[in-house]
Regions:
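ATP-dependent carboxylate activation and anion-phosphoryl transfer catalytic cores
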Residues: 1-93, 97-110, 115-119, 143-144, ...
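C-terminal amphipathic alpha-helical interaction region
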Residues: 111-114, 123-131, 137-194
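Periplasmic-binding protein-like
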Residues: 280-286
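A conserved helix-loop-beta module that forms one wall/lid of the active-site cleft
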Residues: 308-378
């Protein structure tokens, strides 16, 4: 967030900060909509962490004055506080409009321009109109609400302008294909800001969604996959466009792609880039969980975007297959159908369901959210006291359930990286973890080839991996995590995307797995 905010993209303030915040995964409107106790709010204001911006908004919502916030926060500059106070007042205006019955379809053009120009995302506007509904546990706004705001904005022909980054700080003229989106304080012209000369372009334009900021759960390894995917796209004679919001990675170097967009990796920002480019294809499986999480929402938006002239193919594994691999209940059905063994587990959407699942499975349990980065929120719980503490922090909704699994103690864990063209599977490597199962793969040491696995289990791993790739219809890369207890093999999870071990596998084996996977997503076969 600091690296992004320091670039000062977008205007007026605090637009650069809101863009930076939207780039961090958990946003201001996410954090600030929680029913915070007063003491916790004071702590969030006082201690300089990524929670502070959300706390600033909440303080102004509760009627704090600028001097109150300045005193509690230890001296945040008044210049910034005035702007956050203004945004909080504008958010209150949106909320009041919702209380008076305004729906997304009713938003006037003037208000839409002002709200977008101030830095509010479509999701934040939808949430504010709904009054930030909470019910003890965090309640997320429905995607349909955000979709309604986007449709109204497009109906009003309000789109961001894309500005080129001056990479030479005005010392001399420099033309670099770096862009960022801005609504310029609400005065944005109407209509889609297409790439200049787009009608003369002859090559297909393929967009690669990057992995975003490097943080716990999302490392630089995913950027490796994005860079090699771009190389494969260009080798095939297409234009490669990257959307990424991390200025310190290789994928955002000036000569990596044909065009680069420094924008948050959200559905709203990605859709605007796709419209600007009139993109022919998009690759989501190389940017880790951040990118693959866009698969289902983007698939839901495609009919609307196609109505605006976009003829986009979601390259590689289908969004439905991504959901089948990622959704616990669907994958359990898949595992039974294919003949795979999984630890005993349940999906829970309410606190009551979580406790019922734990009682049914018995301690110890492994509990984690679905669709998250790098094991965020994953815990091994051994008693009711630990469960109570975990539930105080849990975010639950039907859209974001918790996965409760039997914990396999004294088990060995394996990682498998592979690629598939839909009919044939190439296994890049089978990696044995040094630590026992339950240590997240991002924190574990692994080695190639495995040293402590019987030939029988090794053959079963290869067989199950091929079954999973072909039966799921994977096109591109995928990663499977297995556990072995005694001579019994279990599937822990399947990730229909590149993994953090891809660079290790490629360098250890000499097989450019990411580049091969990219070519498969674009329609080539392994036999080729």
């Amino acid at each position: 967030l600091k690296a992004w905010a320091s670039l000062e993209y977008g205007q007026p303030h605090p637009r650069p900060l809101t863009m930076a915040d939207a780039s961090g995964g958990e946003t201001m409107d996410d954090r600030a909509s929680e029913p915070l106790p007063e003491a916790l709010l004071i702590d969030w204001l006082r201690i300089p962490t990524d929670r502070r911006m959300g706390a600033l908004f909440e303080a102004f919502r509760r009627g704090y004055s600028i001097e109150d916030v300045r005193d509690v926060s230890g001296g945040v500059t008044r210049w910034f506080l005035h702007r956050f106070e203004k945004m909080a007042a504008l958010e209150t205006e949106i909320r009041a409009a919702g209380e008076l019955g305004m729906k997304a379809a009713d938003i006037p053009i003037g208000e839409m321009r002002r709200w977008k120009g101030a830095g509010f995302t479509d999701l934040h506007i939808a949430d504010a109109l709904a009054g930030f509904p909470t019910s003890g546990f965090k309640s997320l706004p429905k995607d349909s609400d955000e979709d309604a705001v986007m449709r109204r904005r497009h109906e009003l022909e309000i789109h961001p302008r894309f500005r080129m980054v001056d990479s030479c700080a005005a010392e001399f003229a420099a033309v670099t294909p770096y862009y960022y989106a801005t609504y310029e304080g609400g005065s944005a012209p109407t209509g889609i800001d297409h790439v200049p000369g787009l009608e003369n372009f002859t090559k297909q334009r393929i967009v690669v969604v990057g992995s975003g900021p490097i943080r716990i759960g999302q490392g630089i390894e995913f950027d490796y996959g994005c860079v090699h995917a771009v190389g494969a796209i260009r080798d095939l004679g297409h234009e490669a466009i990257i959307i990424n919001n991390n200025p310190e990675t290789v994928s955002t170097d000036f000569d990596t792609s044909d065009r680069l967009y420094f924008d948050p990796l959200t559905l709203e920002h990605s859709a605007e880039v796709l419209l600007r480019e009139k993109a022919h294809g998009i690759l989501l499986q190389f940017g880790g969980q951040t990118a693959i999480n866009l698969a289902l929402p983007l698939a839901g938006r495609l009919p609307h975007l196609e109505g605006m002239g976009l003829n986009l193919a979601m390259q590689g594994t289908t969004p439905d297959a991504v959901d089948e691999a990622s959704d616990r209940e669907r994958f359990e059905e898949f595992a039974k159908r294919v003949g795979l063994r999984m630890p005993n587990g349940r999906t829970a959407s309410t606190p009551e369901e979580v406790r019922e699942a734990v009682q049914e499975i018995g301690y110890p349990v492994l509990i984690r959210p679905s669709y998250v980065l790098g094991g965020r929120g994953m815990e091994i719980l051994s008693n009711n006291r630990q469960l109570d503490a975990y539930m105080e922090e849990a975010y639950l909704s039907p859209e974001r359930p918790l996965l409760v699994d039997e914990y396999l103690g004294n088990a060995m864990e394996l990682d498998v990286d592979a690629v598939c063209d839909g009919t044939e599977v190439l296994i890049g490597a089978i990696m044995e973890h040094l630590e026992e199962a339950g240590i997240h793969s991002g924190d574990s040491t692994c080695f190639i080839p495995p040293q402590n696995i019987s030939k029988k289990i090794l053959a079963q791993v290869e067989d199950w991996t091929k079954k999973i790739g072909i039966q799921l219809g994977i096109k591109g890369c995928f990663n499977i995590q297995y556990a072995i207890r005694g001579e019994t093999l279990y599937v822990l999870e399947v990730n229909p995307r590149g993994s953090r071990t891809f660079p290790f596998v490629a360098k250890a084996t000499g097989v450019p797995l990411a580049r091969i996977a990219a070519r498969l997503t674009l329609g080539e076969k392994l036999a080729e």
